[in-house]
Each structure stands twice: as C-alpha cells, then as structure tokens.
C-alpha cells in the first residue's frame, strides 16, 4: 500500500507498479495545520481495515518518521502493539540482485567520469563552485548508455584546512596552489548509488601528505582484498586497521557502510558498518562504500571505493594527484 498526499499521488501512479486501488491519498486539510496531521488520515485507514489491534511495525530511526508521527499513532491506536521494525526494509535490501548490481555498475561509470572531470577542472584560481558546476554537469549527463540523477548527498569538496573536516561543500572561494582538495561524489542510476572519493593536490605535495595517502591506499587495498563472501565486516576492518597500526595512524570513525538505493539525506543503507566488532557476514552481492577519511588536525586526505562482495577482488587505487 502507498499512503500519499493527493498532490503527489500522480508520482505513485506513474512511477510505481502498484494498482490504483492500493494507492491511498489524503488531502490538503492535513498539511501543516497542527494539531491536524496526515497520520490522522492514516489512523482512519487502519481502523477501516480493522488493523487497529494488530502489531504495527514502524521505523523508529527513519529520517522522516518524526516523534510527532509516533505520538499520533500511540494516541490514535491505543489497542495496537507498536513495535520498532529495526530497519526491516533496509536489511531486505542488503543483498543485491544481479539487476541491482547492473544499475550500480552503470552508476560507477558515471562516478568515474565525473571524478575525471573533477581532476581536470580543479586548478588554482578557479572558484570551488565553478568546479562543482562542472562535476554536477558530468553526474547528470552520465554516459552514452544512461543518464544520471540527483544524488542523495551533494558533491562534497573540503579544501585546504577543510580537508580536516568531513562533509563540507563548495563555496565561492578560489582554489589555492599548495592546498589539497577532497572530492566525494556519486553517480546515480534508478536511485542506486556508487560513491567514490579522491584527494587532489594543487602543486607539489608535502611529504607528510604523500606518506598519509600511501598508507590510506594500502589500508583500503587490504580491506578490499578481505571483502569476500563468508568474511565479516570485522574481518575487513581488521585488515584495514592493521595497516594503519603499522604506520601508527589513528582513526576513530568507521571506514565503510552498505550502499544501494538512496534518497536524501543519505546514500547509506544504515545496516552494515566496516568497523571493528561488526560481525555482519558478507554475502555475495553485498555492496558497501569503503571510505578512508584520514584527518590530522589542520589537514587530511581521503580515498574511497564502492566494493562488491564476490569470490575475487581486484582494484587499483589512486595516489594523491598533483594538478
């Protein structure tokens, strides 16, 4: 069933496989007229179908299931047993079909093309926003085979001291010779994402950045080589952090998360984490974004790959690139 605002119902009729009788609409009187709320209409629907005494699963940690939604359900359905479904749909998406893998491969090609544009475009004196304009053009233009879509996260572009922070976006400031820039982006095909990140160095890089980037790539490669069905997320993490330990590099944040379908504000699936102690077993066609964010006070480097669990892995990682 699809429960949707009347103004947006056309999207459900056009974009889904649902029969019309399974699309339930509510009108404008429920929109932003507190205390009236769309869930008042949802409660009426549940009562009409005699579901008000059943177990009702809700996604307690969903981006769009608010505290007010929850309170409405509790008040309107006092005899129902409302339970956290604990990311039920997310876990159902965890293992991809071959068709889904096909979409992600197409998204990967778009990511590669857009990153190439980023590498060719970023230069001293250019505004960050102008570079992102070219990157976004490439992401939407896609490939001759398939066009792109908007990503769940906009292109990220921390620059200079900003490389020591995460998830910064472009400004109208200009790129500076001698500084590094991190580019994180994703191609999208039928809402399937395949993100990647690279570090661009303008001018001659400092030795500490070269060393950090080499260690980052080595750690990523070690983790990727451990990405095989039957291994756990912890196995991948142990290989990754084993390399960092060798170079005495400290990293507290996770280094990967499952990916697939995504809508704003996130392209992660909120299931698997590549982190020590996550014992989730990798199955064939499990996909995750393995992202190595290395931050060292006032500077940082980063590289990432989208990885698929198969019986073999082979991937050549980049190095920090002078432009």
Segments from the language model and where they lie:
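Conserved AMP-binding A3 loop
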Residues: 320
């Amino acid at each position: 069933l699809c429960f949707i605002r009347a103004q947006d119902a056309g999207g459900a009729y056009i974009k889904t496989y649902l029969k019309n009788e399974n699309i339930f609409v509510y009108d404008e009187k429920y929109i932003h007229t507190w205390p009236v709320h769309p869930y008042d209409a949802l409660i009426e629907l549940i009562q009409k179908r005699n579901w008000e005494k059943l177990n009702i699963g809700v996604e307690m940690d969903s981006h769009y299931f608010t505290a007010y939604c929850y309170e409405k359900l509790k008040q309107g359905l006092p005899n129902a047993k409302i339970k956290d479904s604990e990311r039920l749909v997310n876990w159902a998406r965890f293992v991809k079909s071959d068709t889904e893998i096909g979409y992600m491969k197409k998204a990967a090609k778009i990511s590669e093309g857009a990153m190439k544009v980023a590498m060719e475009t970023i230069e001293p004196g250019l505004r960050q926003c102008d570079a992102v304009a070219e990157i976004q053009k490439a992401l939407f233009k896609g490939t001759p085979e398939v066009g792109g879509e908007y990503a769940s996260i906009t292109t990220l572009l921390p620059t200079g001291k900003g490389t020591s922070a995460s998830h910064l976006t472009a400004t109208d400031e200009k790129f500076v010779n001698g500084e590094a820039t991190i580019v994180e982006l994703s191609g999208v095909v039928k809402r399937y994402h395949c993100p990647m990140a690279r570090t661009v160095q303008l001018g001659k890089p400092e030795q500490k950045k070269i060393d950090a980037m080499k260690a980052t790539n080595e750690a990523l490669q070690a983790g990727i080589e451990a990405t095989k069905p039957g291994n756990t997320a912890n196995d991948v993490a142990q290989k990754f952090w084993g390399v960092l330990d060798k170079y005495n590099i400290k990293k507290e944040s996770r280094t990967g998360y499952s990916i697939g379908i995504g809508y704003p504000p996130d392209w992660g699936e909120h299931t698997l984490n590549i982190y020590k102690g996550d014992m989730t077993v990798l199955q064939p066609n499990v996909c995750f974004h393995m992202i190595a964010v290395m931050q060292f006070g006032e500077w940082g480097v980063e590289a990432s790959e989208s990885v698929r669990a198969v019986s073999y892995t082979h991937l050549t990682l980049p190095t920090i690139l002078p432009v």
